[in-house]
Amino acid sequence: MAPVGAALWRSLRAHQVYGANTDVGKTIVSTFLCNAVNRLKNQGKSAFLKPVSTGPLDEADDRHLQRHAPNTLTKCLYQFDEPVSPHIAAKTFAIPRDDEILSSVHRTLSDWANDGVGFALVETAGGVHSPGPNGNSQADLYRPLRLPIILVADSRLGGISSSISAYESLLLRGYDVHSVLLFKDDYYQNHEYLGNYFRGKSIPLVPVPAPPRRPQEQDPDSRARDLEALDKYYSSVTKSTDVVSLLDELVLKNKQRVEYLDEMASRAQKTIWYPFTQHHGMAAKDITPIDSAYDDFFQTYVTADRSAQQGRLQATFDGSASWWTQGLGHGNPGLALSAAYAAGRYGHVMFPGNIHEPALALAESLLKTVDNPRLQKVFYTDNGSTGMEVALKMGLRAACDRYGWDASKEQINILGLKGSYHGDTIGVMDCSEPSTYNQRVEWYRGRGHWFDFPLVKMSQGVWQVEVPATLQASLGGNQQFSSLDAVFDVESRVRSDAGQRYRKYILETIERLVTQEGKKFGALIMEPIILGAGGMLFCDPLFQRCLADVVRGNPQLFNRGRLTEPQPQTDLSWSGLPVIFDEVFTGLYRLGRKSSASFLGVNPDIAVNAKLLTGGLVPLCTTLASNEIFNAFTSPEKRDALLHGHSYTAHAVGCQVALDSLRTMNNMDEDGSWNDFKNDWKQPHAGDTARVWSVWSHKLLHNLSHAESVDGVFAIGSVLSISLKDAEGAGYTSTAAKGLQTRLAAGGPQFNVHSRVLGNVLYLMSSVTSKQETLRTIEGILREALL
């Protein structure tokens, strides 16, 4: 089922009515608000929607509106007879899925907008966290719609606490509470206390007289008197100046919300300097306002001309995973609670010389998760680039200490791969070869040697390892494989002819660089498997394995001029050069495994994790290192310490969110949450599941690999990469993928796809919680665009 956009129209003011508890008067409030709208000629027609109702039909809330607000359109989507919570009442019926409920609500509101309705209320059942039919909290069930809230507070004893708790639960989930109403009670005076509380939040609170009490007798005369009393009550409250003023306020807020979204792009163009963006020729129309985000989707503002009756927000699949950060979905309430808990417990506290529980627990959990016996220490930084700066400092210090080099007198280089990218801070920029990213950076120097390498792709339905033409004399020709699992059978391939060729080429190259050119190298730095920003370059895992093996197995290459080679102290000591893995992008389940190093059978001496570390919520980075690397900075001298840090180092909010994110992802791995995806990639006569798999279907890859415009495709974990043919050459400056990006952005009537391109490569990336149904829908759009 296609996702729904959040609910926003120019002409229709739609609000959701939540209660601080059950039996606080939600339907009473809905009735007099609709009656007041009907009475005021400038408010348009009113409508009332009850998505889920429980209890006898003659007591249903929509029936109450039909009786006491006869000029209001009413509708109930799902009625269950038993007067209990919806998740219990629905058990004896065919339970509608949450997405079906959302679609029905959105479709009903859209129909009403087209019919000229000006005011609509969507009333929930029970309290804020009362379960829906599938057992999920209503606050989460309806969150994709993000309707502005009218909160009915509780005027009874204990109502102050329940009302504030209800408000905070809504706020935590990203709802906007536009107004609060409750019944006056001169004894408990909750309206006085809550009025002051919500005034401090700039939220109007309207106290109204309590409705007449229901008669205890249920004879016809008593019921008739009750109905008459209610009619008089509604007639009185409807005319209240406070109620009329509230309706005017709701009109204004809807108008202001639409106007703000209207202006956001043009205002941003005037004030925002965007990263990785050439602003020359950039217009306001090129900027997409995002009103909110939930799960895999942005809610983007439609800037194209639309009538007042058409919805203004559209669901947009976050195809770049918001620069590769998304793991557990946007607006994740669990992570929001984690952040709020840590913010409430700590705020931010100084880290050096101190320790707090989230930082310690995360460090221990991360070391256990990556399961690399070399790694024993965790250094915290703010983002991937700074984490790699720290890794570089660690590696170079260890190498210089072992080999007796003075980096102030001679240049110490790194070994890496062409197309690598490790961040935008100046040190790690020098760890990449000259490119579009750095050629206009004034302090860039480029200190290293970067190996070209064979690429993995599927073309014409066949997995291939494609060797650059300039290397075929040394590495041999292209190879074909029966499956992606076969490509990753590194332990077998390392003994093959290709493995021997790779090692010989790497060894001879390093010998030439050191002996003939006199270069010194202090670290081997690699992005395991996929070089992301360089163009989603899928490196042959065998080549990376051989590179690490040659560096570690030939320490004599790097100690030229030293009489004796300091031998590693243990089997876990680094040898040759410290091996640094930049897993900022590829680590922590992005490629379907806890660590992308496991694909290579290589345990790095230093590893950096960032993007998925916090599930996609806040910045945080860890640089993991061995004790031997750590000891290179240990001495009586302060100057020998790792003098690097940030004001918000190991901030408690990020550490707590990361701890809970890591726990969630580990649980998903253990409980088989991805088994359906794995089974899709299982080969005939293979084991239970594929060793290498993707959330993107194998059939999609096979289909796209035959497309006329496609040079090659691959998918692994949550990453899908499509390389398009370009007669003028591939690379970051290519525009070949722009056309496909434009077609995806156009999407369909219900949703579209946001994506990023890297030259001739368009990639899509899901979260680790993406549903198979959602991704197969996206795949359908891709097929339409390319086949």
Curated annotation (Swiss-Prot):
The lineage of its organism: Eukaryota, Fungi, Dikarya, Ascomycota, Pezizomycotina. Pfam families: AAA_26 (PF13500), Aminotran_3 (PF00202). Substrate binds at residue 54. In the N-terminal section; belongs to the dethiobiotin synthetase family. GO terms for biological process: biotin biosynthetic process. PROSITE patterns: AA_TRANSFER_CLASS_3. ATP binds at residues 23-28, 123-126, 184-185. It comes from Emericella nidulans (strain FGSC A4 / ATCC 38163 / CBS 112.46 / NRRL 194 / M139) (Aspergillus nidulans). Its cofactor is Mg(2+); pyridoxal 5'-phosphate. This is Bifunctional dethiobiotin synthetase/adenosylmethionine-8-amino-7-oxononanoate aminotransferase. The keyword Chloroplast does not apply. PANTHER family: ADENOSYLMETHIONINE-8-AMINO-7-OXONONANOATE AMINOTRANSFERASE. Bifunctional enzyme; part of the cluster involved in the biosynthesis of biotin (also known as vitamin B8 or vitamin H), a water-soluble vitamin that functions as a prosthetic group of many carboxylases, such as acetyl-CoA carboxylase and pyruvate carboxylase. Catalyzes a mechanistically unusual reaction, the ATP-dependent insertion of CO2 between the N7 and N8 nitrogen atoms of 7,8-diaminopelargonic acid (DAPA) to form an ureido ring. It is found in: Mitochondrion matrix. The keyword S-adenosyl-L-methionine applies. Pathway: Cofactor biosynthesis; biotin biosynthesis; biotin from 7,8-diaminononanoate: step 1/2; Cofactor biosynthesis; biotin biosynthesis; 7,8-diaminononanoate from 8-amino-7-oxononanoate (SAM route): step 1/1.
